Amino acid sequence: MARIAGIDLPKEKRVEIGLTYIYGIGLTSSRKIIKATSVNPETRVKDLTEEEVNALRDYINKNFKIEGDLRREVALNIKRLVEIGCYRGIRHRRGLPVRGQKTKTNARTRKGPKKAVASKKKK
């Protein structure tokens, strides 16, 4: 069982895909890591040697901000935007889309479920 950055990588997957289970490492970063550590990308996680796992772990720790550190940094960035009261911070505070999307009809993901409005009765 390969354990990198506190994450158990899935045994049956290829190393290239297994590394993407770590928060902060996508497919492009995964391929870059594998190339730098000269590990065969077709190798399954269960077939990695201890030296290969250590090489991957060392390279990731030196060159990438992952898991808790990355989550903390993102949270602090959002908190900073909210505190300075800029447009993006206000959108975060109100729970609305931050990147300029229209909100008249869509944006349900950010706004949450629809809120019922009482209908007017006709006379």
Curated annotation (Swiss-Prot):
GO terms for MF: rRNA binding; structural constituent of ribosome; tRNA binding
One GO term (biological process): translation
Disulfide partners: none
Keyword set, alphabetical order: Ribonucleoprotein, Ribosomal protein, RNA-binding, rRNA-binding, tRNA-binding
UniProt xrefs under SUPFAM superfamilies: S13-like H2TH domain
Domain of life of the organism encoding this protein: Bacteria
Pfam families to which the protein is assigned, alphabetical: Ribosomal_S13
Region (Disordered): 95-123
Cellular compartments per GO CC: cytosol; small ribosomal subunit
Keyword Ligase part of the UniProt annotation: no
Quaternary assembly: Part of the 30S ribosomal subunit. Forms a loose heterodimer with protein S19. Forms two bridges to the 50S subunit in the 70S ribosome.
HAMAP family: Ribosomal_uS13
Physiological role: Located at the top of the head of the 30S subunit, it contacts several helices of the 16S rRNA. In the 70S ribosome it contacts the 23S rRNA (bridge B1a) and protein L5 of the 50S subunit (bridge B1b), connecting the 2 subunits; these bridges are implicated in subunit movement. Contacts the tRNAs in the A and P-sites.
Stated family: Belongs to the universal ribosomal protein uS13 family.
Protein name per UniProt: Small ribosomal subunit protein uS13
